[in-house]
């Protein structure tokens, strides 16, 4: 059986944690930042976690993570 391919887009966006979850960046931090509050931008800086319903899909895209 051939090796499974890693989804390269997903590999650049998600990192596996020690407990089996996936870290990702928050959305809404690229442009049009002047109207967003400092507090909102500060909270978007922290790493986000992939939600439970999406874990299986992300795991399938990253078979060797």
Curated annotation (Swiss-Prot):
InterPro entries membership: Ribosomal_bL35, Ribosomal_bL35-like, Ribosomal_bL35_CS, Ribosomal_bL35_sf
GO MF entries: structural constituent of ribosome
Segments of this protein annotated with the region Disordered: 1-24
UniProt cross-references to Gene3D superfamilies, sorted A to Z: 4.10.410.60
A GO BP annotation: translation
Presence of the UniProt keyword Ribosomal protein in the record: yes
Pfam short name (any one): Ribosomal_L35p
Positions with biased composition (Basic and acidic residues): 1-10
Entry's Gene Ontology cellular component terms: cytosolic large ribosomal subunit
Keywords in alphabetical order: Ribonucleoprotein, Ribosomal protein
Family: Belongs to the bacterial ribosomal protein bL35 family.
NCBIfam families: rpmI_bact
Name of the protein this chain belongs to: Large ribosomal subunit protein bL35
Native species: Tolumonas auensis (strain DSM 9187 / NBRC 110442 / TA 4)
């Amino acid at each position: 059986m051939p090796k499974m391919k890693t989804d390269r887009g997903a590999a650049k966006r998600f990192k596996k944690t020690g407990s089996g979850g996936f870290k990702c960046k928050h959305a809404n931090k690229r442009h049009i930042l002047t109207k967003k509050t400092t507090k909102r931008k500060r909270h978007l800086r922290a790493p986000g976690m992939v939600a439970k319903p999406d874990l299986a899909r992300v795991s399938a895209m990253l078979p060797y993570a």
